[in-house]
Amino acid sequence: MQQTKFGKMYLDHDSVVEYSEDEIVEADRITLGYKKRLSMIENQMRHLLEDFSLDVQQIEPILADLQKYYDAFLQLLQKRNKSLQCKRSTHQPVPSPMNSQTSTNAKVNLSGKLMKFQLNSVQKFDEENILRILQNKIEFEHYFQIDKGKKQKVLLLAVYQCLNGPTRLHKVLNIEGIIHNNSIRTILGKQVSSSKWTVFLYDVKLVLLAHRQDVPNLETSKMIVRYGDLFPCALYFKDHTAY
């Protein structure tokens, strides 16, 4: 989408949306304000997570602020998208039924506490889809075997969702015994385990993954997993070369 000095928005399909100059300036000002605020909160989270102490009193308010501003920003974008759709010119091309197909062919069937995914067994998904699954309101205790007796060397990998989608923190922390730390459990809210992986979940789009001590260091440039690996066995990074 491009903006001209005449106050028009040119969409990808070459249709034109009429806007006054004041409307464009005000909309961009509001959007920029949210973007700056989110960036500041993300920087605060990064610095706090780099600190091994991970003070609960500091982190929880920032996570709450991040959720609040992120939700407000999504509402703003949805409102502007609806406005754009209403004002599009009539010569916009009608999408072909072949192009209306969703990007993934996965279908979710819920039956009590069972969840099954129907898709090609060789199809893989990136971290964006992993986050989308983990953010659902699901009782993960039904899908993972909790093992509180193991002590593990933890690779702490923080993934959270920002304006452009999931983004990793630059710092990767290696901490001994963090799984049994009550303060960490308080911050994250949920802790579930499988035989090979421990997954920390938090509703504010923050996912922390821990791996076994005997698993080599994981390269964080790619997170690849199949839906079938998430439920019920949770074999994260099963096909990763470092595994």
UniProtKB/Swiss-Prot annotation:
Main location: cytoplasm
Compartments reported by the entry: Cytoplasm
UniProt protein name: Protein HUA2
UniProtKB keywords: Cytoplasm
The protein's role, per its UniProt record: May have a role in actin patch assembly.
Gene, per the UniProt record: HUA2
Gene Ontology CC terms: cytoplasm
Keyword Cytoplasm: yes
Other remarks in the entry: Present with 1360 molecules/cell in log phase SD medium.
